[in-house]
């Protein structure tokens, strides 16, 4: 397994932009191995100094995220990674969790992450579900998405506030009246 990670470090370190190769390899490895092997591989990959290999590991975590310990690790540890690319993959991994669980059934976890002290954790939700109203459940219940996102409009983190603005702008393309109503309720200073 260590040799495999070393080969990934060599291969992935040449990738400067994007995440498709890491995502594709993680999915292939997830599908072709049992969960225990994939889990060990993910944790070993996440220890890599090569951020692209950590990205690969986080994609694996997303596929394995129905396991509570994996979801907790994503929330509490991956969210502390200092590489912004790894944070982007955390958002994708969280969306993978929600997709696997079912968006409506994932609401308690979504709400928990939105209240987390770490801004990277909160942002993983807003970015992970960026096109919220294209997702099952939220497509039929757009106000559920809008209310949750709008609750972060005054977040202490500019990083999160910018994400909130971007997500609301995306939602306004499908539901302009709902966003207009929401924005009309804001007290702007």
What are these regions (language model features)?
Residues 1-189:
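Alpha-helical scaffold domains
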